[in-house]
């Protein structure tokens, strides 16, 4: 697979879980003999939701909730067939969203 690049984007709400998953991917691929760039931390997406505390009145009393989406980017340059096979078998947590582009 000379001249190819695999780009992996990880998304999660928990920054500790995404860092552990990224470390697992990097360790697995480097053991298989491919070169890795990353994990590169991408900007954290922050969604803020404003909710009125009371169901009927007291509009001035509001509560804010936020949801942060942490993202990481990993590039695998010139992946070996062994590296691709080990990536397919890798077991990662369910709360990490993985996008793979060739």
From Swiss-Prot:
Task: Tell me which PROSITE patterns the record gives.
Answer: RIBOSOMAL_S10
In its UniProt record, which GO terms are filed under biological process? translation
What Pfam families would the database entry show? Answer: Ribosomal_S10
Q: Which Gene3D superfamilies match?
A: Ribosomal protein S10 domain
Which SUPFAM superfamilies is this protein grouped with? Answer: Ribosomal protein S10 (SSF54999)
Matching entries from InterPro entries are given as: Ribosomal_uS10, Ribosomal_uS10_CS, Ribosomal_uS10_dom, Ribosomal_uS10_dom_sf
Query: Keywords, A to Z?
Result: Ribonucleoprotein, Ribosomal protein
Question: Which molecular function terms from Gene Ontology are attached?
Answer: structural constituent of ribosome; tRNA binding
Where does it sit, as one GO cellular component term? Answer: ribosome
SMART domains the UniProt entry points to: Ribosomal_S10
Report the protein's function. Involved in the binding of tRNA to the ribosomes.
What family is reported?
Answer: Belongs to the universal ribosomal protein uS10 family.
HAMAP family linked: Ribosomal_uS10 (MF_00508)
Assembly description: Part of the 30S ribosomal subunit.
Q: What is this protein called?
A: Small ribosomal subunit protein uS10
Q: Which organism is it from?
A: Micrococcus luteus (strain ATCC 4698 / DSM 20030 / JCM 1464 / CCM 169 / CCUG 5858 / IAM 1056 / NBRC 3333 / NCIMB 9278 / NCTC 2665 / VKM Ac-2230)
**Lineage, top ranks:** Bacteria, Bacillati, Actinomycetota, Actinomycetes, Micrococcales
Gene name, per UniProt, is: rpsJ
């Amino acid at each position: 697979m000379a001249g190819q690049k695999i780009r992996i984007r990880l998304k999660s709400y928990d920054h500790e879980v995404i860092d552990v998953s990224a470390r697992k991917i990097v360790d697995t691929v480097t053991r298989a003999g491919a070169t890795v760039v990353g994990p590169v931390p991408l900007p954290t997406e922050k969604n803020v939701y404003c909710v009125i505390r009371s169901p009927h009145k007291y509009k001035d009393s509001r509560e804010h909730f936020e949801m942060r989406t942490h993202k990481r980017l990993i590039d695998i340059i010139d992946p070996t067939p062994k590296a691709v096979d080990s990536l397919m078998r890798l077991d990662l947590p369910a709360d990490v969203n993985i996008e793979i582009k060739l």
